[in-house]
């Protein structure tokens, strides 16, 4: 996501690598999201999440921290992939999704120490929140997708500090 401040406000641009888009064009995740396209799907979705969240927050006249931006993107990747997989599997819960998105992730080696810490913290908070979402709304005998969606919407609207607190304390 590219952001430029101008005298009239702000200009946003989203760059998605052509090779990512080309691979997604060959293996469309809207048709079948699986191991072959999940990484590219998440890469593209993260950029779209950043773009949308900055735009939405600006419209609400709210500042956004980089940590908040990363945390929301992690939750958005999980929620979006979950929604696609539930639809593609006729409602069967994709138990492997959490593990694939939150366990065993590696950071790129060129990141600074501050960037690594920010990504780790966002990842940790999102993992805790998403695991509790699964437990509360999806893994029980009676799944409650409408309540899950309401919780995700509420989380989206929280400010930076409240979002972090909620992710860690959500029960």
Cite the ranges covered by each PLM segment.
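Post-HExxH zinc-binding segment in Zn-dependent metallohydrolases
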Residues: 63-102
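Auxiliary, metal-adjacent structural segments of Zn-dependent hydrolase domains
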Residues: 1-25, 34-37, 84-86
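Active-site recognition of the HExxH zinc-binding catalytic motif
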Residues: 41-55
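Pan-zinc metallopeptidase signature
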Residues: 109-171
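Acyl-donor binding region in acyl/amide transferases
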Residues: 37-40, 44, 59, 65, ...
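Long, hydrophobic, amphipathic alpha-helical segments used as structural scaffolds
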Residues: 56, 81-88, 134-137
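Short helix/strand-bridging catalytic loops that position acidic/His residues to coordinate divalent metals
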Residues: 30-33, 55-68
């Amino acid at each position: 996501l590219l952001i430029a401040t101008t005298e009239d406000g702000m200009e946003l641009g989203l760059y998605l690598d052509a090779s990512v888009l080309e691979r997604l064009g060959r293996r469309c995740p809207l048709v079948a999201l699986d191991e072959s396209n999940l990484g590219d799907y998440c890469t593209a979705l993260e950029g779209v999440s950043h773009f949308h969240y900055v735009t939405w927050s600006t419209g609400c006249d709210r500042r956004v921290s980089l940590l908040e931006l990363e945390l929301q993107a992690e939750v958005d990747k999980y929620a979006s992939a979950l929604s696609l997989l539930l639809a593609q599997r006729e409602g069967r819960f994709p138990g492997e999704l959490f593990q694939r998105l939150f366990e065993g992730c590696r950071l790129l080696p060129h990141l600074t120490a501050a960037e690594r810490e920010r990504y780790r913290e966002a990842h940790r908070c999102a993992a805790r929140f998403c695991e509790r979402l699964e437990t509360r709304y999806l893994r029980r005998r009676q799944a409650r997708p409408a309540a899950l969606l309401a919780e995700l919407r509420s989380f989206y609207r929280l400010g930076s500090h409240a979002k972090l607190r909620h992710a860690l304390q959500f029960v």
